Amino acid sequence: MNGSLEKLIVEKARAAFGAKTSIASLTALAGDASSRRYYRAVLAGPGTPPSVIVMELPDGSSLPLSSEELAVFKEPPKELPFLNLHRFLITIGVRVPQLYGQWEQEGILLLEDLGDIALWDRVQGLPESEILGWYRKAIDELLVLQLAGTLARDDSCIAFQQRFDFRLYMWEFDHFIEYGLIERPGVQVSMSATEELRKIFADIAHRLESQPPCLNHRDYHSWNLMVHNDAVAVIDFQDALLAPPQYDLASLLNDRVTDSIIRPDLEAQLLRYYLDRYNEGAKQPFNRDEFFDTYLLSAIQRDLKVVGRFYYLDIVKAKPGYKRFIPSTVRRLKRNLARLPQTEKLLPMLADHFEEMR
């Protein structure tokens, strides 16, 4: 951490909390798959919170903070997607970190410190009944986002200016083909095989695009949900968009190694819990069979995207840390592909390239 950054953070902390604010310590936090950087600043001074999280924007710039593939805005955003979504989520009652100050041109945001305990960390070692309780809390918060958020639709919120459509689904499928297969060291895949995969993927994309959309977080998983004061708080929401409601639910119950604790019986209970509460508040209730089919298609599509993404991070971005999650993701894909007649034909095609599917 350079001295000029420390000076800038001190300056902004004083602007937010008063001239007598000082920083007792400043610690870099482990990053995620993005180019954002985070620090925890322990504060001292009258009226200050004990600590804050400093978000440093990429290269200290005010460039839009969202996924690189999500460039589907009709016009360039006038503000950071994070700030735009933060304002909207606050109004509908989603628990997100408080924003203490924003200096976009200098690349600094000061946020409430929600601690270090993600939902995934909180449920480790717990009995199944308590795991069920925590994931129900996560579903309750998700339903606020999806139902209240969709009902309060505001076209100035950028999440309503973009949706998971055929183009975006196929972008993610092609990302898998490119980095999960073609560019992956030691893998050879024929042109005819990739063409056949794209036909099957296009059918899935059309099916998902035809589903009624609602507001989705887009990365609603156990590492983006923080446990704070016995409640679940939501972070990393800047890529929110319109998608089938099952997309975020599939993210919650199927990400990385989540199914090592969300076993089939627990998954079934949580699916029933979600569906019952969604149908209570939705204008268009779901038929259970249709709901489950779309849930599985969403889980399959997302896991294929994740495999491609994790190989991309390793091959292109030199971030190999996410590769450890690929085997468990592929094993889950094998199980889910076999649960639907329209996707089980993918199993032998992918088993040629992933030993976990054999």
Q: What are these language model-derived features?
A:
Residues 35-42, 53-54, 202-249, 260-261:
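Active-site acidic catalytic loop and adjacent metal/ATP-binding pocket
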Residues 160-204, 273, 334:
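Active-site catalytic-loop/activation-segment of kinase and kinase-like phosphoryl-transfer enzymes
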Residues 42-165, 169-171, 175, 182:
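ATP-binding pocket architecture of kinase catalytic cores
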Residues 131, 135-138, 169, 194-197, ...:
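Hydrophobic packing residues in well-ordered alpha-helices of helical domains and bundles
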Residues 1-22:
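Juxta-kinase regulatory segment immediately upstream of eukaryotic protein kinase catalytic domains
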Residues 24-44:
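ATP-binding glycine-rich phosphate-binding loop
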Residues 309-358:
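Helical subdomain adjoining the active site within ATP-dependent kinase catalytic cores
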Residues 177-184, 245-284, 297-317, 329-337:
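Active-site activation/catalytic loop segments of kinase-like enzymes and analogous catalytic loops
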